[in-house]
Amino acid sequence: MRVGIQGWGSEGDLRPLVALAARLRRSGHSASLVVTPVDGKDYRPLCDALGISLTTVPDRVEITVQQIAQEAKSANPTKLITKVLALTFDPYVEPMYDAARDLCARSDVVVAGPSCWTLKAASLATRTPHAIIDYVPGVVPSRLIPPDFLPPWRWLARPGWALLSVLMDMAFAATPRRFFAAKGLPRIRHVIPDVVFSDHLNLHAASPSFWPPAPDWAETHCVCGELAMPDDAEPWALSSALRSFLNEGPPPVLLSLGSWEHIVQDRGLDLLLASARASGLRAIVQTKRSDVEVRQGETFILPWAPHRRLAPMCCAVVHHGGAGTTHMALRAGKPALVLPFILEQRMWAKRLARCGAGRWLSFWKATPERVGALMREVVSSVALRERAERMASSMVNEDGAGVAVRRLEVLAAASTASPDSKPRPTTSMGERRS
């Protein structure tokens, strides 16, 4: 099976696609990856080590993360993400679409990362079976369950999804509508489902133990599990300084804002460091703004480390609510404090609080005093810790990448057996399984 994968975004958006490509390779399939990194990260060394064919489109995004941070300063989550799209996605739609058509020409199945609707457009133009990777199951409409930003009352489901559809259309529909119309492709009615979902297969890269599917979802939606990087993909060992720090006292709290630190360069690192001091707890602060390890009393500043390796050595995690970091903390059995920037991160934060494994506070309302107090609460709570440990136990045997590969194999086989047939499309309000 030849699989073409296209992704746009930051490290949190693209690493799972690399992980999927790696699993496809290890399963005996061919995987070609096209990426548009908005944070300037070079994926060539990692992909070379994993034997993955990689193309970066364009060769270099003509705006730096520093410029993005200067331009995208809004504390309004919708305005923030639309500004990032205007700076880093919209200018490259045509070359991304050309690359997507090339992927379709040499693939049996194509897979698009979140927001990467250029590949859906190309798949429609070339009639190539198409799947989408999504990191937020909470945006799949249901007649029974409302969107995660609302209370879980069934009567809110229909008006809640109607409201979310309107908000998504207002924020994100204009560019794909113009593009699809210009290419003579089917009309975009609504962002959900026409832009963000596939009629063939949608792989929601989340733990089914943590975020189970609604009972009325269509079979085209699969909560497959986290797409985790192979443990041997990125060799890492504790430095002597970090080992000494860990051995000198109780387990620290791990703090990281991931790639979102780029957006708030003036504030992000300062908030984490000040919050660590205000908490009175030992802490490891991971940052992209330092190239060297630095110790400041009971706080250790770390440039990079694989979260999955580091988190088990800590007592709790403070993060921004990305899908990957949320799973990292849960798999390690550690309670978390989430500081979300945008809606999808807030959905993860609320889901975590609802399951009893963490607390959350909007990043835009965070102060060192409030974050420090919540850190102490999370670390001292036996109930939060025990719930996080139970979640870790329930997730231990989940194999998201393996499930995703098997679903893609089924999609490819169905296409080969009946190349002119089209799978039943997903309805906007959640089609029942047959």
Where are the regions that the model predicts?
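Alpha-helical membrane-targeting segments
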Residues: T78-A86, D90, R143-K183
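Short, polar loop motifs at secondary-structure junctions
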Residues: T36-D42, P114-T118, S207-W211, Q286-V292
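Donor-nucleotide binding loops and adjacent catalytic segments primarily
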Residues: S209-A316
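Conserved nucleotide-sugar donor-interacting segment of glycosyltransferase catalytic cores
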Residues: F89-G160, S209-F210
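Nucleotide-activated sugar donor-binding and catalytic core shared by glycosyltransferases
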Residues: M1-V34, V38-L54, P159-K183, R187-P193, ...
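Conserved nucleotide-sugar phosphate-binding/catalytic loop shared by glycosyltransferases and other
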Residues: P37-I81
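Generic beta-sheet signal
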Residues: V34, V57, G113, A131-V136, ...
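Short gly/pro/ser/thr-enriched loop/turn and capping motifs at secondary-structure boundaries
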Residues: G40-D42, V61-V65, P137-R143, P147, ...
